Amino acid sequence: MASGGSGGVSVPALWSEVNRYGQNGDFTRALKTVNKILQINKDDVTALHCKVVCLIQNGSFKEALNVINTHTKVLANNSLSFEKAYCEYRLNRIENALKTIESANQQTDKLKELYGQVLYRLERYDECLAVYRDLVRNSQDDYDEERKTNLSAVVAAQSNWEKVVPENLGLQEGTHELCYNTACALIGQGQLNQAMKILQKAEDLCRRSLSEDTDGTEEDPQAELAIIHGQMAYILQLQGRTEEALQLYNQIIKLKPTDVGLLAVIANNIITINKDQNVFDSKKKVKLTNAEGVEFKLSKKQLQAIEFNKALLAMYTNQAEQCRKISASLQSQSPEHLLPVLIQAAQLCREKQHTKAIELLQEFSDQHPENAAEIKLTMAQLKISQGNISKACLILRSIEELKHKPGMVSALVTMYSHEEDIDSAIEVFTQAIQWYQNHQPKSPAHLSLIREAANFKLKYGRKKEAISDLQQLWKQNPKDIHTLAQLISAYSLVDPEKAKALSKHLPSSDSMSLKVDVEALENSAGATYIRKKGGKVTGDSQPKEQGQGDLKKKKKKKKGKLPKNYDPKVTPDPERWLPMRERSYYRGRKKGKKKDQIGKGTQGATAGASSELDASKTVSSPPTSPRPGSAATVSASTSNIIPPRHQKPAGAPATKKKQQQKKKKGGKGGW
């Protein structure tokens, strides 16, 4: 290599500087020195390679890729496939990185490592799993722990996004990363309690490892723990403990972690908790899901879920056009997905356009028959909300894969019974029983449907139709006395002889008798307490003997208290129980008497005489026809007067209000 260079420094000396800076990790100075070498020889392959490495170490991936693409001819023999693919990977050009790796002349270990990362980002988990398995088996270096962590991450992704039951790879949970990935796999399988325990272990390991790492900054443990706490909050949310989950989510957001993917997921989960409540908070949180680079941090299903929730939030905030725009975009990306069309239908229903919503759902059902069941269930729900039960039943019966299910049969029979369409309800039973007869004969669901059909027919008086069902049940279990009794009851109306013949199969009274130890019953003390039931005494009941009746009354009767001014020598007033104005010696008020009697009749007339002259006080003749709700009665004669205790005297025409005033002035009758 020719000597010379900038400022009289020789090229070997420059290379020595590059080597020294590289060992110290000072790639900025190393890059400057490499550029000096390239000024001397611009086509130096080693210098170009070093420049690319320095740029990558400094995070200048775009510049590094430009250097590689600019000097393609020079670097043809010394291929930089790994460096090029790595730059494309870090620039989120994943498809280009895959092509670069696949076109490489030689598949080195570091290219395989990168290949696994690229496959993971492309969500090709089966291929990715095979690559990492091969690397774990055949690699022997200090990065074995990282490879196992990546392998467990692939298993967790399969469990969550593809619902694949993870196989036991025998990975020991020695680090918090491995524990975290194991917990994620358990969440995908629905084992939430076990996942929470593993996450708590991951938290302990994380705190321990970070406390031992003296080089780590104070933000590092918070960032690592935030991911674990976020997953804990997600488990709490799945368990229905939304208040605890919400509190933990908000604590993480207050820490302001730099991971935009974590913030986006937490914000999305808070929005799902808020639903149609606290929409102002949801509007603030949705901004976190729009941060730059989020699309490169999350999986496709996570991004899709965030978009769905954005559409729902737009619907809850009455942004109809925004809701339609987002849901239409989602439908164009995934035409077969149910949620976009369901969101559009929900928006139409909020606008009271139920007919359009049903038409939209019907169109989707025709285009995607594989997803028609869920759509038709929604259509039936809308029909029921409109009060069109019969149409809803027709829609439900058109779902071939569900119409024989016990739950569907129950719903249809209930709705047909509500519509008093018993024949259609029986037809639903018949079709379901026939399906089980052909596919799952004598299964528990089959026999249960037969019994329910028989009970339903008996309930609505279809005993003749219930006979075949009861016979089938009795043949399955001849010892079922209840079914036999129902069968005999049904035959008694149709074929009495057959009912009589079947009654012979009933057990005898001797076999039905209970095996009871009579002596033990006789020797027992009997009931220690019997609750008395009170009842009304009717006129037909036999009277008790006078002595017994008086004796019981004397026992229950308490001695009354006499008033303080009681005088035993004075005879009590026999009319003391009557109100003052109803007593025979009552003469009315003295003050203002003439004033009150103005217009009441001729002067000198008594109250009794005035009542006889008053036509309104005379007994009216019976009506020619009874009033609605009452019987026609003949008026009683004046000699048969009801006692004053139950009827006011004829000479008391005053109003109720005046009576109350007089009672207050006259006082109650006393001794």
UniProtKB/Swiss-Prot annotation:
Q: What's one GO BP annotation on this UniProt entry?
A: SRP-dependent cotranslational protein targeting to membrane
| Impact noted for substituting M580A | Does not affect RNA binding
Crosslink position(s): Glycyl lysine isopeptide (Lys-Gly) (interchain with G-Cter in SUMO2): K391
Using the UniProt annotation, give all residue ranges assigned to the region (Required for interaction with SRP68): 9-163
- Impact upon substituting P579A: Strongly reduced RNA binding
Disulfides per UniProt: none
Q: What is the effect of changing Y86C?
A: Loss of interaction with SRP68. Diminished localization to endoplasmic reticulum
Q: Which family does it belong to?
A: Belongs to the SRP72 family.
What does the subunit comment say?
Answer: Heterodimer with SRP68. SRP68-SRP72 heterodimer formation is stabilized by the presence of 7SL RNA. Component of a signal recognition particle (SRP) complex that consists of a 7SL RNA molecule of 300 nucleotides and six protein subunits: SRP72, SRP68, SRP54, SRP19, SRP14 and SRP9. Within the SRP complex, interacts (via N-terminus) with SRP68 (via C-terminus).
- The name under which this protein is listed is Signal recognition particle subunit SRP72
Which gene does this sequence derive from? SRP72
